[in-house]
């Protein structure tokens, strides 16, 4: 399920990120990302919590980077971090505004990255 559901190449799977986020944001029990929330609400010197959050972010970015590499990105790590910023921003905006449309806005911003990736591949 998720990114690997159905047909499509790596770029298509990357594009699936944002509709999946939109589905998550539309759930009644969406309260944002527990990792972002935990860092925001706890002692900034809490290294254990930060380490757990960083490990989660690395896993997410690693999955995105592997798809970016498969798609032929010139700099898969950079693309993963760019998409990660859009993802995290959409999560925070959706949490604050209660508007699942934040995922669509992030998808529109990501589209220029995907178009450049398709042109270079």
Language model segments and positions:
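Alpha-helix boundary/capping and short turn/kink residues
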Residues: 7-11, 29-30, 47, 58, ...
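An amphipathic alpha-helix signature
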Residues: 15, 58-61, 65, 107, ...
């Amino acid at each position: 399920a998720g990114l690997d559901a159905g047909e499509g190449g790596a770029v298509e799977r990357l594009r699936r990120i944002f509709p999946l986020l939109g589905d998550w944001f539309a759930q009644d029990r969406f309260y944002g990302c527990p990792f972002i929330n935990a860092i925001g609400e706890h002692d900034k010197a809490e290294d254990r919590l930060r380490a757990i959050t960083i490990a989660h972010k690395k896993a997410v970015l690693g999955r995105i980077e592997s798809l970016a590499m498969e798609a032929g990105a010139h700099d898969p790590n950079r693309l993963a971090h760019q998409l990660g910023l859009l993802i995290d921003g959409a999560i925070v905006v959706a949490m604050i505004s209660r508007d699942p449309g934040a995922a669509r806005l992030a998808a529109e911003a990501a589209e220029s990255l995907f178009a450049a990736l398709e042109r270079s591949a």
